[in-house]
C-alpha cells in the first residue's frame, strides 16, 4: 500500500500570498503568522511574493493570476470578512470561498483559504494570533504540506 502525505518542508518551494487591505489590523497579523510559518519551515524571503488587494472580494482574481503563472508551488489567500448589519458579509464570504476553491481545481496549484469569516471583530482578533492561534500560520502550514503533496503525487 502506498500512502501519500505532504511534508512540512518549505525549503526550495515558492509561495505567493494575496492579502486583503480591508481590516488591515487583522490581515497584518495573519500575514505575520503566515510568514513566520513559512520561514520556520525553511522558506527564504526571495521565495515569497506578497500581493495586497483592496478587499477580500478581490482576492480570487489575483490568486488566480498567481496560480496561472505557475511560478508558485502554492498560493495563500489571507483576508478578514466580519459580519455587519447587511447581507454583504454573506455575498463576500461565499464568493471568496467559492472563487478560491475553483482556482485550485482549475489550475492544480494549491490555493489555501486563510480568509477569516467571523461574526464579530473580537472573533477575528482571537483567530489572528491570540487564544485561537493564528489562522495565517495555519494556512501557511497547509500550503507547505499541499505543495509537497502535489509534488509527490505527480
Swiss-Prot record:
Active-site residues, Swiss-Prot/TrEMBL: 88
A GO biological-process term: riboflavin biosynthetic process
A single GO cellular-component term on record: cytosol
GO molecular function terms attached to this record: 6,7-dimethyl-8-ribityllumazine synthase activity
Keyword field contains Transferase: yes
UniProt keywords, alphabetically: Riboflavin biosynthesis, Transferase
InterPro entries tied to this protein: LS, LS/RS, LS/RS_sf
Catalytic activity: (2S)-2-hydroxy-3-oxobutyl phosphate + 5-amino-6-(D-ribitylamino)uracil = 6,7-dimethyl-8-(1-D-ribityl)lumazine + phosphate + 2 H2O + H(+)
EC number: 2.5.1.78
Residues holding 5-amino-6-(D-ribitylamino)uracil: 22, 56-58, 80-82, 113
Pathway as given in its UniProt record: Cofactor biosynthesis; riboflavin biosynthesis; riboflavin from 2-hydroxy-3-oxobutyl phosphate and 5-amino-6-(D-ribitylamino)uracil: step 1/2
Keyword Transferase: yes
One Pfam family named in its UniProt record: DMRL_synthase
Enzyme class: transferase
Binding site for (2S)-2-hydroxy-3-oxobutyl phosphate: 85-86, 127
Role this protein plays: Catalyzes the formation of 6,7-dimethyl-8-ribityllumazine by condensation of 5-amino-6-(D-ribitylamino)uracil with 3,4-dihydroxy-2-butanone 4-phosphate. This is the penultimate step in the biosynthesis of riboflavin.
Family per record: Belongs to the DMRL synthase family.
Protein name: 6,7-dimethyl-8-ribityllumazine synthase
Annotated source species: Thermoanaerobacter pseudethanolicus (strain ATCC 33223 / 39E)
Annotated gene: ribH
